[in-house]
């Protein structure tokens, strides 16, 4: 699958970005398949920032489903190393890629620091990963 930071790697943790988890919650079968595949291999993870985004944006009637999903994933912390790397990227890309949020920089740095494959649909938010492709595209 070419949607990985390190294309072709199969044994790395899969770091699910918020958009892919939302697609799973909306019933997108491709997102669900990716999540189930990673979960069955013990490789499904999200950043604590993705956890924050989902919890902050959920409706009351979604609470139990979202918490169940988040609790089933390994939550990768945003350490000082992650913050430093994210800051370096923000400084490098802030003029050429104005729409990238601080959270996206931190998610990207989380993937790099933890050696994880980033699975996202928003590849334009992650210019630091040159070979990154949309996670839900058909192979």
Protein language model regions, located:
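Active-site regions of enzymes building and remodeling cell-envelope glycoconjugates
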Residues: 73-74, 131-135
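Active-site neighborhoods of divalent-metal-dependent phosphate/nucleic-acid chemistry enzymes
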Residues: 2-10, 74-121
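Short, well-structured N-terminal submotif of metal-dependent ribonuclease cores
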Residues: 1-46, 55-68, 139
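Alpha-helix capping/helix-boundary segments
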Residues: 20-21, 50, 82, 107, ...
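Generic structural signal for small/hydrophobic residues in well-ordered secondary structure
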Residues: 17-18, 54, 86, 111, ...
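A conserved hydrophobic position in a structured secondary element of the catalytic/binding core
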Residues: 16, 46-47, 78, 121
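A general structural signal for well-ordered alpha-helical segments in protein cores
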Residues: 31-32, 51, 63-66, 83-86, ...
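Short, polar loop motifs at secondary-structure junctions
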Residues: 59-60, 121-124
């Amino acid at each position: 699958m070419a949607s990985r930071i390190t294309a072709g790697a199969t044994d790395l943790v899969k770091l699910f970005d918020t958009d892919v988890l939302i697609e799973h919650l909306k019933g997108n079968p491709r997102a669900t398949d990716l999540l189930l595949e990673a979960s069955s291999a013990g490789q499904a993870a999200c950043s604590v920032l993705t956890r924050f985004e989902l919890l902050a944006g959920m409706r009351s009637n979604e609470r139990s489903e979202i918490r169940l999903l988040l609790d089933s994933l390994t939550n990768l912390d945003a350490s000082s190393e992650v913050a430093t790397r994210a800051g370096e990227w923000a400084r490098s890309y802030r003029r050429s890629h104005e729409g990238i949020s601080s959270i996206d920089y931190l998610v990207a740095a989380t993937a790099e620091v933890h050696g994880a494959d980033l699975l996202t649909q928003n590849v334009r938010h992650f210019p630091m990963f040159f070979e990154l492709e949309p996670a839900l595209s058909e192979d």
